[in-house]
């Protein structure tokens, strides 16, 4: 059998058919968190990037591989076409403005020796299907195409490809957002951040403004949740803090996240949040194998909707980096806007481990999700 590489990269209320798509990414995150040997690690992951790569693999799959991937997406066979249409429609809703930039790209690189079915090529080539020789400078060619389309450089290296590679799927997500109400950089100060291993000093950002927030209860455990809006984008960062953040994460579903967000009311907050930067380069093959094991098995994988050639997936990576500062997420400098409180604001300080979720609120797509254990 021939091997396939899938690489998903990121740099940061859906139609009902895509609820399984969203949930697959959440489940992958949960498996990463619960499988981490060191629970003191920061995590950043792109649920959308993961689910998108799995969905595009589904479009090529057949037989039991197709069944497993349909189950992963909680789709019936007859819903696959409409779900793909809804996915593309959802992507179109992620508008870009001068304050917020969202760029999602998909590239499928297929070796020139693989015979692609004409029907597959006709249907999907416009989404970024490329032919090349993986034994002739494939790394540089792939990086050049991906950088031209996404602006990201050096997304693959020689350790990710070898002479057996005939197919590489690369999904990139780049998000740059400016806060609706930026933190006042003059108020950033050193403060304590405490986890179960001790206390350290971190740069603590501060803003006093009206935000959406509330205390939510999950199985008698309380969590403070607040929503930070990005300017002119329909994208928000949700922050949650409490005594048992693993329990909080394990409780997340698309429906619950939608419900929690609906319970957030407008309040004046004196919000204190650490400035943080996280980068994770992660092999996620074992995570995907939990959901669709046959596509990694050379004797069982089937991608006959794309080709009759015997292919299977042998590697799956995700590289993600996120920077959060006073201006926003992966942000450029912008004018500071600070609202002053008319009454005594509620103080909320994220000085213990917390979870963050960057979500496109119209579609429900979770672009990024992670936890901050230390900074």
Swiss-Prot record:
UniProt KW keywords: Host cell membrane, Host membrane, Hydrolase, Membrane, Protease, Signal, Virion
Native source species: Monkeypox virus
Gene Ontology terms: biological process: negative regulation of plasminogen activation; negative regulation of vascular wound healing; proteolysis
Any one Gene Ontology cellular component term annotated for this protein: virion membrane
One Pfam family per UniProt: Serpin
One annotated GO molecular function: peptidase activity
SUBUNIT field: Interacts with OPG185/A56 protein.
Record's subcellular location: Virion membrane; Host cell membrane
Designated name of the protein: Superinfection exclusion protein
Domain of life: Viruses
Gene: OPG040
């Amino acid at each position: 059998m021939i091997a396939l590489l899938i690489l998903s990269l990121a740099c940061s209320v859906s139609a009902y058919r895509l609820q399984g798509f969203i949930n697959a990414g959440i489940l992958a995150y949960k498996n990463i968190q619960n499988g981490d040997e060191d629970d003191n690690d920061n995590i950043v992951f792109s649920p959308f990037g993961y689910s998108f790569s799995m969905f595009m693999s589904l479009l090529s799959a057949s037989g039991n591989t197709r069944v497993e991937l349909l189950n992963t997406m909680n789709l019936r066979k007859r819903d696959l076409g409409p779900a793909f249409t809804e996915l593309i429609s959802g992507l179109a809703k992620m508008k870009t403005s001068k304050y917020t930039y969202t760029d999602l790209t998909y590239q499928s690189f297929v070796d020139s020796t693989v015979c692609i079915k004409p029907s597959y090529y006709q249907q999907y080539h416009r989404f970024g299907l490329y032919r090349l020789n993986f034994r002739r400078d494939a790394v540089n060619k792939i990086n050049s195409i991906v950088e031209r389309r996404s602006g990201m450089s050096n997304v693959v290296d020689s350790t990710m490809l070898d002479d057996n590679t005939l197919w590489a799927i690369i999904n990139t997500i780049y998000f740059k957002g400016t806060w609706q109400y930026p933190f006042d950089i003059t108020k950033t100060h050193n403060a304590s951040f405490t986890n179960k291993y001790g206390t350290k000093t971190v740069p603590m950002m501060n803003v006093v403004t009206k935000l959406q927030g509330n205390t939510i209860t999950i199985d008698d455990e309380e969590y403070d949740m607040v929503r930070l809006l990005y300017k002119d984008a329909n994208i928000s960062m949700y922050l949650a803090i409490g005594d048992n953040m693993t329990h909080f994460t394990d409780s997340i579903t698309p429906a619950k996240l939608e419900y929690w967000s609906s319970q957030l009311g407008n309040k004046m907050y004196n919000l204190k949040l650490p400035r943080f930067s996280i980068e994770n380069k992660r092999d996620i093959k074992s995570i995907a194998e939990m959901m669709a094991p046959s596509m990694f098995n050379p004797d069982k994988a089937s991608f006959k909707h794309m080709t009759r050639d015997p292919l299977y997936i042998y590697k799956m990576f995700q590289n993600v980096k996120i920077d959060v500062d006073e201006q926003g997420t992966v942000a450029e400098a912008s004018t500071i806007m600070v609202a002053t409180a008319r009454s005594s604001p509620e103080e909320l300080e994220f000085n213990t481990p917390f979870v963050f979720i960057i979500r496109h609120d119209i579609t429900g797509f979770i672009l990024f999700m992670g936890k901050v254990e230390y900074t």
